[in-house]
């Protein structure tokens, strides 16, 4: 094992550990809160489910990383490869859609518009979000099922490539795989468009609200303005992290067709681990309960706050 492979394993292991810690923290805080009150808000439910899915996703990515390094032949074998691909695709698509649902929830709760359609959705936000969650679950199942043929084709041509028996039939199969793979990436467009729509609606709503505050001679740092800004920061950060994750996913998936296949795969795998951990950390900073618990925990560790005591968390 060379320097590059060792660095790859260290980075993968570090990001995996950080991602597991961050997402387990979310699950424990929200889980203990639910256990005490027997109630959980819709946003907490989405964030907790997202954390659970990301723990699974990180485990899948780490398994894939170790197989690439220590057992490339097993990694490219039909059954193992298809199991990893199906598991990765489902958890990946569902977690991306859940992050999108969270942005939509923030938009409906915080933004203010007088359009009848928006008001109808805002007044029925809980019912709308429940149906949306069911919809994205079915959509994730459908997108995964639609890509099963792609996974089978990949296993076929990797097997043929290993025998070095490159025929015209093989070239046709590989071209077919390219086409299906490119079309498969289009499944990422809908959540991206919905997230952008929620972001711009919040921007427009913030602009209108700020103008109203200025006209009334009121301070622009009112609770509604701060809520707008916090939601915009979360959605915008999520958007840029998602773009980075999408780029990493493309590098990892198209790595088989690049000159340095193994190197491209390793770079892609390391980059993909950043999103499940980074976005969850952003959610902690954007959620008052999670942020307060996180800051209290840090103060306890540094000896500035005794466990169970209340400190001035926010200025």
From Swiss-Prot:
It is found in: Membrane. Its main location: membrane. It is a multi-pass membrane protein. The chain crosses the membrane at residues 6-26, 42-62, 94-114, 128-148, 186-206, 234-254, 266-286. GO terms for cellular component: plasma membrane. The keyword Nucleotide-binding does not apply. Residues 1-5, 63-93, 149-185, 255-265 are extracellular. Belongs to the G-protein coupled receptor T2R family. Several bitter taste receptors are expressed in a single taste receptor cell. This is Taste receptor type 2 member 3. It comes from Pongo pygmaeus (Bornean orangutan). The lineage of its organism: Eukaryota, Metazoa, Chordata, Craniata, Vertebrata.
């Amino acid at each position: 094992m060379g320097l590059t492979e060792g660095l790859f394993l260290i980075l993968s292991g570090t990001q995996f550990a950080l991602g597991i810690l961050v997402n387990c923290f979310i699950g424990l805080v929200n889980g203990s809160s639910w256990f005490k009150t027997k109630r959980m808000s819709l946003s907490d439910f989405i964030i907790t489910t997202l954390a659970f899915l990301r723990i699974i996703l990180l485990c899948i990515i780490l398994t894939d990383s170790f197989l690439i390094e220590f057992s490339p032949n097993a990694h490219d074998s039909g059954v193992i490869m298809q199991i990893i691909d199906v598991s990765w695709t489902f958890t990946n698509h569902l977690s991306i859609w859940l992050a999108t649902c969270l942005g939509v929830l923030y938009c409906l709760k915080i933004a203010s518009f007088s359009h009848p359609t928006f008001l109808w959705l805002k007044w029925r936000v809980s019912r709308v979000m429940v149906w949306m969650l069911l919809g994205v679950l079915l959509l994730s199942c459908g997108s995964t099922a639609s890509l099963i043929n792609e996974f089978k084709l990949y296993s076929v041509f990797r097997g043929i490539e290993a025998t070095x028996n490159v025929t015209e039939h093989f070239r046709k199969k590989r071209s077919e795989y390219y086409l299906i793979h490119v079309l498969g990436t289009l499944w990422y467009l809908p959540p991206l468009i919905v997230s952008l729509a929620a972001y711009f609606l919040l921007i427009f709503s913030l602009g209108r609200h700020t103008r109203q505050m200025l006209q009334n001679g009121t301070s622009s740092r009112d609770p509604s303005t701060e809520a707008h800004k916090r939601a915009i920061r979360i959605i915008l950060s999520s958007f840029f992290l998602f773009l980075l994750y999408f780029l990493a996913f493309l590098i990892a998936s198209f790595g088989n067709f690049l000159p340095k296949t193994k190197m491209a795969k390793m770079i892609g795998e390391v980059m993909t681990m950043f999103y499940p951990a980074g976005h969850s950390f952003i959610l902690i900073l954007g959620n008052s309960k999670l942020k307060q618990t996180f800051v209290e925990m840090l103060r306890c560790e540094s000896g500035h706050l005794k466990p169970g005591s209340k400190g001035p968390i926010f200025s």
